[in-house]
């Protein structure tokens, strides 16, 4: 390729770090690239909870629009930010080898403790995620959840300054930024589940681009792709997004893999969980199977409750 590939990315420190990981992988294949940066709707509207903004693709739409127009050649995303239904003309061609998918607890240095159990009653725990909120309250209903927006360094600063006593963040972001020292403990599956696709970097391209598509696909990590396909199928089958407390994680075992999933109401008073064997030959089918299992165990009632509370739009006819 003569001209450098144009890589669309958000302009946050973490997003740039992830885009540079892709740049380095391309350079190993002798391919030069340059970054084209964006501020998305989710980056601009920091004074509102994510769940109330309501738009799909809060952190991805602007990148996708320009990719479709040919203003960039590929886009790099945190896979958990990508809606499960791709815009017409775009595909996720590759996911890189996954970082640690777990969430972590970050405690203010003035609090003595090594886990959620050690937080004093009434402690303020920061998160902007309904999934994290629900799991936190299901574990410790005596804690207060505080809205915490901003990039990773901003959220860490708010913990250090004591605006909140603790925060829950993605391990992958802290690892990629070299901020391991802030981690108090990891929140392990299946007791605590991350977002579908968490920890995976996605490369999105135009589906008819015969020049860039093969290059992007050469970066794909197959085990990660199989895992996240199952997780995202589970999410899609439950009609989930940032407005629904849903978690999913595919975990390799000695004999294959397990797919864990959960859905909760916003208050954390009701949580439905399930685990099935993951069929690596049909990962999407495994995700749908687990979603159907949870629907039969109470997930449908949770979704209907969220709709009545106006957290969700009405289901669309098929």
Regions found by a protein language model. Give the residues of each.
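Small-molecule-sensing regulatory modules
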Residues: 2-39, 44-48, 52, 138, ...
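Short, well-ordered beta-strand segments
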Residues: 6-8, 75, 93, 126, ...
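Short, structured active-site "lid" loops
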Residues: 47-74
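Paired acidic/hydrophobic, glycine-rich loop segments that form the ligand-binding mouth/hinge
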Residues: 56, 73-77, 165-170
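Short acidic active-site motifs
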Residues: 62-63, 115, 154-155
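A conserved helix-loop-strand patch within extracytoplasmic ligand-binding domains
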Residues: 79-82, 88-142
